[in-house]
């Protein structure tokens, strides 16, 4: 380094996926310049990476209009906490990770107080509210986007933008071989395994986990020797799922962390929508994506969203590689039937794996966090 002046960086990640990506960025930035200081909103991974979290991201992880309204007090207090810091002691840089509505309000505050803004992982302007690109252009100094098809949206609006690859391309790696992983989870290698991925938000657990368990009950009746495994998100505790699990009567192996080891032992996975579908795609595991929100949220979204798919892995592919069951279609019968098709039809499962390999190719070759860390240092006027 040519400069040793310490810089204070506010970083905001409102969800579990943002916590993961933020942690990778912070680790890489601190490797390049250990004098940097990070604080803001994050979860356990960002804290472990060295971020002082003023607000825990688990308190912010809600989705949908009705769901946000139910948590408006917590979200408002978090905003006021960060706003006060920006006003009273402005950071040298504000890094925003996804979480668009909250983060764009914070970007306005930063702009008024002369704080540079880097937006890492773009709001989904290509999916809905495309007019936000112009607002972003007024409020954000630099975009670091993770999908190549996002670049033209910002270039057309004159927003400085860099395609940095997808951070998951660096991280989605099992820690051991499949046989070893099966043994470590206490699973029988001679019996098939279905993964249950109910999400990282408590709202998702309440809305989606019951139907996931009901579909698992149907699968157990159809395939008596089937095994189930559930990786518990870092934003949740055993208490969030234990009552529903106990009521289901199912024998489910629950583990925390090691999510990629879990994925690789699965023959198929039932999952909520979101970043996790990309992780599963990178592991090449056939999946069924389910999506349920309040009727109001869904009806509003149907009128605003401009893409043909809910699952980000299908959006990246540009076609339906894996089935999506939305709202009333996300019934236990339909979920069990789609998983059963994977288990009963090896050719169909193999075709799905080939489609997921195409998604993996489009996500880039790795090095994302390092590239974003380089942008951070550049915006701070530092050199590596």
From Swiss-Prot:
Catalyzed chemical reaction(s): a lipid X + a UDP-2-N,3-O-bis[(3R)-3-hydroxyacyl]-alpha-D-glucosamine = a lipid A disaccharide + UDP + H(+)
Gene Ontology terms, MF aspect: lipid-A-disaccharide synthase activity; phospholipid binding
Pathway(s) served: Bacterial outer membrane biogenesis; LPS lipid A biosynthesis
Keyword hit for Transferase: yes
GO cellular component labels: membrane
InterPro entries for the chain: Glyco_trans_19 (IPR003835)
One GO term (biological process): lipid A biosynthetic process
Pfam families documented for this protein: LpxB (PF02684)
Keywords, alphabetical: Glycosyltransferase, Lipid A biosynthesis, Lipid biosynthesis, Lipid metabolism, Transferase
EC number of the protein: 2.4.1.182
Keyword Repressor: no
Biological role stated in the UniProt entry: Condensation of UDP-2,3-diacylglucosamine and 2,3-diacylglucosamine-1-phosphate to form lipid A disaccharide, a precursor of lipid A, a phosphorylated glycolipid that anchors the lipopolysaccharide to the outer membrane of the cell.
Family: Belongs to the LpxB family.
Identification of the protein by name: Lipid-A-disaccharide synthase
